[in-house]
Structure formats: C-alpha cells, structure tokens
Amino acid sequence: MDNYSTKISERLWNQPDKGELEAERENTFIDDIVQKAHIERELLKSLDGIRTAFDGGAGCGRFSILLAKQGIHVTHFDISQPMIDKAKELAEQAGVADRITFVKGALEDLSAYADRSFDLVMSFDAPISYTYPHQEQVIGELVRITDKRIMISVSSRLGSVPYLANPIQKNQFILDENSKDPWVQQCLSRREQMIEGFSFNKESLVRAYETGLLSDVEKTKEAYEQGQTPWCVTYHFMPDELENILKRFGVKNISLAGPGAYARTIPNEILKKIMNDPKQRADFLEFCHMYDSNPYVCGLGKDNLFAKGER
C-alpha cells in the first residue's frame, strides 16, 4: 500500500462537506449516539491526573472539546482541514478554543512528538484502522507518546463481518428519516433495491473473517488512481489481537468493550422511541455502557472495538 493509506484518507476526509456532515452524526444515527456516549463515560471517569491530551483523528472535536471543557489542554490532530475548521468553530462556540491546539497531519507520522508527550492519548471512531497496512505501527506510536493513559477505538472484525450479509444494516439506526444527510436518504431510497440485489456470499465472509479486510485493496488503489474517492482500506481487529498488540507495546491494565453490542439487538422502531424520550434515552445509554463493557460481548460492538490501558 506504500503511502496509499494517507493519500486515500486525505482525499476522502478533505471533501468540502465532511466537516458539516460528521458534526451532525449524533443527530442522525443512533449507533453514533451509543458509541460516543460510551466513550464519553469512559473519558470522564479517567481524567484523574490528566492535564494534557492528544486526540488522534479528532474529527470535528467531539472529544477534544469535551476534555477542554474539563480544563485539559488538548492537541487536536486530524488529516482533514474541513474537519479542523468545523472543530475550531465549535470550540469557539464552547469557549474553549484557547485550550486546544489544532494540527493537520496523518497518524502514520507522529515523529514531531517526543516520547511520553501527553498524559492521555486517544483515537476514536477507527482512524487507526484506516492506516492499513501501518495500523500496528500507528498503535505503537500512539503508545510511545502516551505518558499515563491510552484510549482507542478501532474497527471490529466480529462486529463488522456480519454486515456483509446485511446490506440494510444502517437503516436500523436512522434516527430522523427526514434528515437531509445524503447517507440517510440513500439508505431509505435504496432499501428495496439492496434487498433485491443481495445474495449470500460465503467466500467473501470467510475472506473478511480471516484477513480483517472487507474490501479489495487493489480495487481501492485503482479507484484512487482513476480519480475516484474510495472509502479507506479498513483493517478490522479481533479483540485478542488488539489486546496483544497493546501488551507488546507495554500497555498495562487493558480492558476492552464493544459499544453498540446491546443496541444492535433492538429494531429501529423501538430505538427511535427510546431516543425520543429523555428519561428512557438516559437509562438506555447507561445500560448499554454496562452491557457493552462485558468482555464476552466486546467483539460484537456495532462497528468499533474500544480499548483502554495504562503505561
């Protein structure tokens, strides 16, 4: 892949509308709500002794801003200028822009940062997985710049492989069917077409299960060279694999979770009813965190596998 991971990510995430669309995910998709609520709980209970943080693949600042509100100085690091611009806007609105340093860069190169530069290092919503085939090296570099705690979420193999046999999986998590988000409208308008065109392909499932790759690497590279904007080649981790990588780089007291493992069992009609009632929503998200933190379900999170540990 050489440096294709960086080039593909740069083209994908620097599309002009990325900042606005990503900033609205929690108003659009229920799985995003569940995942981010889980991470927020984990962060807020792990800030003892934390004064500085590095947010790798920080996007629109969902967690950079959260930590800055707690008085922490955050380095917001992302490959996308539209995302950074949106994060700056939101940080200004929240009154915490003076506590955030915005840096444009790729996770494949963290050489600008010295060992143990940050009390807390975090990287959420799978940017590590988008660095294939450099994902292990990137984890090692994130650990290297960590002084106290590291928290990451990567693409989950056990959580994602089933979706090769479910082309309408995202429909389950649509919160607002009237959303103008192009992805929402595509999910709704193409639902019957996706069902009609589906056929079970055992070979593709076995290949994804064994390799951690749900897409064809060479076809993705070809699409990029032809001027298209393909989705990043994404590496999906097994739980024990991720834990062993972290251990190899010296991380201790590791725990894993699968945000979305409980929510994925509930139909859209019920999920929407829960989300639209503040009391039910709060109780639901609290229970999701408890259930999804059970190590026996960590691999079956909606898309992501969460890990935290200490240096």
Give, region by region, the residue ranges found by the protein language model.
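Conserved class I S-adenosyl-L-methionine
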Residues: 1-48, 50-57, 62, 151-212
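Class I SAM-dependent methyltransferase SAM/SAH-binding core
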Residues: 62, 66-97, 101-109
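A short acidic, Gly/Pro-enriched loop at the edge of an enzyme's catalytic core
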Residues: 112-120
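A short SAM/SAH-binding and catalytic strip from SAM-dependent methyltransferases
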Residues: 120-134
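A short glycine-rich, Lys/Arg-flanked "PGG" loop and its adjoining helix->strand segment in the class I
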Residues: 136-149
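Short alpha-helix
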Residues: 233-250, 256
